């Protein structure tokens, strides 16, 4: 009788058919598993089971769920932050000067770029300021395809993370090109295979697209 009573009280485990992948099932067994990312060489796929905890404030190009999914794949020291919109091209103007003025002195940022087909971007831990004589700043930088839930972390091939010039913004560099290249007036975005992140073209199957909007978020408590 005691065994039958216990069996009635125990909730049956969910069947695997209810989930797309095993990783959708694992969060039921403890919070320590919940935020584990999936690593496939240099590519990371977003775990869509992350519950929104941090918030996006005044943002348009990234919502709370997308932000928390993205954060789950970043280093632990970045996961405690909220995202605050500090620059949006459609509001603040489409020039490098406007961009730099709004992003001045901000070290931890998420840059998002919306095109007709995708939203892509980068997470940077170095200030978005003019680079000295065209040099690249090395930092803990990531590029991502927000539409397809993929993040690429920096490889060991080079340290060409980000360069901000009066006529362009470049993220990543290699023999094949940059992961993200934004022209002077923020009209077009180019993306090529990039050695810095060992990433394919983020706009694939296209190599360039017109920019619909750009938004920068600062990370803070």
Which residue stretches match the model-derived regions?
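Phosphate-recognition beta-domain surfaces
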Residues: 1-221
